[in-house]
């Protein structure tokens, strides 16, 4: 799915009149058997329901509150009493999930599943949302009331193109957004709009909008959940995304204190560490670098809080660095020959990247092999190529743990250093400039929210790259 964390939830896409959206949501939770804490239920008034997910409980949920108070952004959940690791926070019955299977047009979507296939795999869920949003009797209307206002989502796909490129140049976000926008337009024009036009009784004119479709894609990107496959199912297609009421209220933190568990009849949010009274409950969306967080969820974790942050070195940048070290046409030809060999080994690609974390190289095998092949003597490369890559399989022991990078061969370190320098040139600002903005609280406070978020992305990446520069010197 999804610190200013999630965007401020100012007004939902469904008009709820003067009713308290939290009270309405909690009342809805009781009706559908979504088990929250007793104190949450008491705040909303009324009796706690029986049945539903309650049968799945082995102990009552810990006492938590849905609130805007004490959260990093918008609605969140706060522990009203101390919570111990392993305690149950809430249970969501599968019948309360909003998906292509549980929506009121699930039968139609199932019959048309072949026609609705797409690159993203999200079209059926998005059509379910488009229908339920405009259906007066939708059973999820109280849930929609806690959604963020769709017109105020802060994903970079909604930023003006010039602002996006100016603030996020070099981070990889503008390129990812351009691909998203192209795919969204293509899916909408070729699949979604024709389907809605073929069923005008199910989709009113007001939901036949590319703008609304953009917004719902961003919402699904930030708030949906995708159930992981079991180990024996690894060969299957990934599960379709679903909307999980209550679970999507939680904000994200790398150092999270809760985790969503899946079972046959329900989904359970369980504390993974002690949570003191009054502290916010945080879920995790996985190990996400800041550029991924802002791209998919519209927020970042301020430096140095995101321990999962990474920086990318484009694979073609390493090739460019290797070419810069050549002096003759024969040497250039040999670099391309080595690169083609790496492509054949599926170690590199024109759009791939080597991913560097604060303490490890996440693409260790790919980078090790690339440095080895590009730097080995010509005769050794000929022998390796003649063996079709099946020669000496010994790995450089411990070669690309961050602390062992200084122990790499000098030629490897030089190529890696030159690649880092080329990567740093892709940013519009240098580390010193960004450092000055971050260290001056008055200047930082005057930046717009987007400028602050983009600065955090750039700075985190540059710190990793500069660490790599020092280690390769």
Swiss-Prot record:
Top enzyme category: transferase
Positions bound to S-adenosyl-L-methionine: 73-75, 223, 251-252, 297
Activity regulation behaviour: Activated by automethylation.
Domain SET: 60-286
Disulfide-linked positions: none
Database matches in InterPro entries: N-lys_methylase_SETD6 (IPR011383), Rubisco_LSMT_subst-bd (IPR015353), Rubisco_LSMT_subst-bd_sf (IPR036464), SET_dom (IPR001214), SET_dom_sf (IPR046341), SETD3_SETD6_MTase (IPR050600), SETD6_SET (IPR044430)
GO molecular function, one term: protein-lysine N-methyltransferase activity
S-adenosyl-L-methionine listed as a keyword: yes
PTM annotation (N6-methylated lysine): residues: 39, 179, 372
UniProt keyword Methyltransferase present: yes
GO biological process entries: negative regulation of NF-kappaB transcription factor activity; peptidyl-lysine monomethylation; regulation of inflammatory response; stem cell differentiation; stem cell population maintenance
Compartment list: Nucleus
Annotated phenotype, changing residue 179 to R: Abolishes automethylation. Impairs the methyltransferase activity toward RELA and PAK4
Modification note: Automethylated; Lys-39 and Lys-179 serve as the major automethylation sites.
Keywords in alphabetical order: Methylation, Methyltransferase, Nucleus, S-adenosyl-L-methionine, Transferase
Reported pH dependence: Optimum pH is 10.
Superkingdom field: Eukaryota
Any single GO CC term annotated in Swiss-Prot or TrEMBL for this entry: nucleoplasm
Oligomeric form and interacting partners: Monomer, homodimer and homotrimer; these structures are stabilized in the presence of S-adenosyl-L-methionine (SAM).
Listed PANTHER family: N-LYSINE METHYLTRANSFERASE SETD6, UNCHARACTERIZED PUTATIVE METHYLTRANSFERASE
Task performed by this protein: Protein-lysine N-methyltransferase. Monomethylates 'Lys-310' of the RELA subunit of NF-kappa-B complex, leading to down-regulation of NF-kappa-B transcription factor activity. Monomethylates 'Lys-8' of H2AZ (H2AZK8me1). Required for the maintenance of embryonic stem cell self-renewal. Methylates PAK4.
Family: Belongs to the class V-like SAM-binding methyltransferase superfamily. Histone-lysine methyltransferase family. SETD6 subfamily.
Name of the protein in question: N-lysine methyltransferase SETD6
Source species: Homo sapiens
């Amino acid at each position: 799915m999804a610190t200013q964390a999630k965007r401020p939830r100012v007004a939902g896409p469904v008009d709820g009149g003067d009713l308290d959206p939290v009270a309405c949501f909690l009342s809805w939770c009781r009706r559908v058997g979504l088990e929250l804490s007793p104190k949450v239920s008491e705040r909303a008034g009324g009796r706690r329901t029986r049945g539903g997910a309650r049968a799945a409980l082995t102990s009552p949920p810990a006492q938590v509150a849905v609130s805007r108070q004490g959260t990093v952004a918008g609605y969140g959940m706060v522990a009203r009493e101390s919570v111990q690791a392993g305690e149950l926070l809430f249970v969501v019955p599968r019948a309360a999930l909003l998906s292509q299977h549980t929506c009121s047009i699930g039968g139609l979507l199932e019959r048309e599943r072949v026609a609705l296939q797409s690159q993203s795999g999200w079209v059926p869920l998005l059509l379910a949302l488009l229908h339920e949003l405009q259906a007066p009797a939708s059973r999820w209307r109280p849930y929609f009331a806690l959604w963020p206002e769709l017109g105020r989502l802060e994903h970079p796909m909604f930023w003006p193109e010039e602002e996006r490129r100016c603030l996020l140049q070099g981070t990889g976000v503008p390129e990812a957004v351009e691909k998203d926008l192209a795919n969204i337009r293509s899916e909408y024009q070729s699949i979604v709009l024709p389907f809605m036009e073929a069923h005008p009784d199910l989709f009113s004119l007001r939901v036949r909008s590319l703008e609304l479709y953009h917004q719902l894609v961003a919402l699904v990107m930030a708030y949906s959940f995708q159930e992981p496959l079991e180990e024996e199912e690894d060969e299957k297609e990934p599960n379709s995304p679903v909307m999980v009421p209550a679970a999507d209220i939680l904000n994200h933190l790398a150092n999270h204190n809760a985790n969503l568990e899946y079972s046959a009849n329900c989904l359970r949010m369980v504390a993974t560490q002690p949570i003191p009274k009054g502290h916010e409950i945080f879920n995790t969306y996985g190990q996400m670098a800041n550029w991924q967080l802002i791209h998919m969820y519209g927020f970042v974790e301020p430096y140095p809080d995101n321990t999962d942050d990474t920086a990318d070195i484009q694979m073609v940048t390493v090739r460019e660095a290797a070419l810069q070290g050549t002096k003759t046409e024969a040497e250039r030809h040999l670099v391309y020959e080595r690169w083609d060999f790496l492509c054949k080994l599926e170690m590199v690609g024109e759009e791939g990247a080597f991913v560097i974390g604060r303490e490890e190289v996440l693409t260790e095998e790919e980078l090790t092999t690339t440095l080895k092949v590009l730097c080995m003597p010509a005769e050794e490369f000929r022998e390796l190529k003649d063996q079709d890559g099946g020669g000496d399989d010994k790995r450089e022991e411990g070669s690309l743990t961050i602390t062992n990078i200084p122990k790499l061969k000098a030629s490897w370190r030089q190529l890696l250093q030159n690649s880092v320098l080329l990567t740093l040139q892709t940013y519009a600002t240098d580390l010193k400039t960004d450092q000055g903005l971050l260290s001056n609280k008055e200047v930082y406070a005057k930046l717009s929210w987007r400028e602050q978020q983009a600065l955090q992305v750039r700075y985190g990446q540059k710190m990793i790259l500069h660490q790599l520069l020092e280690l390769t010197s």
